[in-house]
Amino acid sequence: MTWTAPTPQPADGPLRGPDRPILEGYLGWERATLLNICAGLAGEQLAAHPLPSSNLSLLGLVRHLAKVERIWLRQRAAGEPVEPLYDRALGKDQDFDHLDPDEAPGAIEALKEEWLAADAAVAGLGFDDTVDVHGEAFSLRMIYVHLIGEYARHNGHADLLREAVDGVTGR
């Protein structure tokens, strides 16, 4: 039987109240949306580059967002000394390049594991806590807003990629 990407449980969060549960809920929703868009596709479909003008693929987006989570929440916000997921010496787009369809199940699991590790890394931080990012003070709140924007942008790309792969829209 051919492996296909699993369908995630829908994420839900509060509609009012303090910033943290709202932003955590919205980030969770964006995270689940990416996996929803990928759900049911085989590794070959996830690794496909269906738009001739772009190196984007669904598998590349999964890998990219795992890298983004690690950088922003674990390395920058929490100060964890974790290794980068991809070697920048090989090029800045290693998350999108040299994709192996057989690695799709592992990439999706790695993304989910990165979510858990990232959430745990910042659980003890306050939303007003700041970290220096290239000479600018970023609050954890701003990092969450940045990540939500990053996911929203790439989920739009993912919608187009999914439609180009198999015609499915609106996931």
Which residues make up each language-model segment?
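Short, contiguous alpha-helical
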Residues: 1-12, 20-39, 43-93, 133-171
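Acidic/histidine-rich alpha-helical segments that form the ligand environment
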Residues: 92-131, 141-147
